[in-house]
């Protein structure tokens, strides 16, 4: 039997824990006769399971003949990609849209005003015809960034909604990237789009998963689950290593730390500002009380609150206990102590 866990980002593993509540909210809304929202933004720290969550949504609708699911890349021409994919899918499913198109992405990607207008017109024409055939189109865009392709697509999507096309959109990415996109003056309508912050996985659910896969005691499964802190990538790493070696937890820690550092923590740390790092560093030394953190860094309550909110939204710290901040990522303090130099 193959290892049911994976170390590959974005790959849906055999053994994974569904976020039924959060994903279900999107599906429930989209399935309404008159949906209250047609756009959702999914935010989460690196390794939080954004891509797998999008795959769950895509799988749900791909099995429904009424829906057409398009998974698009944020770093390519989204309008051209949508035209190409919708044309291909329509031909594959023998949907006669009355279109005389023989265009590939390369032909549609010339960045000239007339070509852009033509692509947008073609896409609206396709959506109109799909609407008349009772079809719905779900656009899924992962790793969202604030670039020209995304801005043009988002602007057009607003038009699709006002023209009552049966279109739906789920975009996922890091919190900062989503915020940057929403702050665009021409895209203020995105502020009304609900944001779903991917929460840590349930420790009991992780415990149950480990017990179902491995022949281990309840106490060992709980110990493993608690080590992950509900971080999906850590859940996969620990399960993968346990499957490969069947060593006890203590022997797995060095490789567990190494995988977290290489594939997640180095990048997460590099994206923190100077004050972000100082706050996280102080917390990593065992100072959890917000008053003590402020005292250590000589900063005002207002400033700490601003950074506290941002670090929580990024999924780096946990502020669920009033007056305290702790690290949300498993063994992040070990990484900071060993590899990160911070001057207070």
Model-inferred region functions:
Residues 35-56:
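Walker A/P-loop nucleotide-binding motif
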Residues 214-264:
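Amphipathic alpha-helical "lid/sensor" segments that cap RecA-like P-loop NTPase cores
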Residues 77-106:
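Conserved NTP-binding/hydrolysis module of P-loop NTPases
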Residues 193-221, 227:
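Conserved small helical "lid"/interfacial subdomain of P-loop NTPases
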Residues 2-3, 262-344:
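C-terminal leucine-rich, beta-strand-based interaction scaffolds used for sensing/assembly
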Residues 176-193:
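Short regulatory helix/loop adjacent to the ATP-binding pocket of P-loop NTPases
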Residues 1-40, 331-334, 342-344:
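A short, basic N-terminal segment
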Residues 113-176, 184:
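Conserved Walker B catalytic segment
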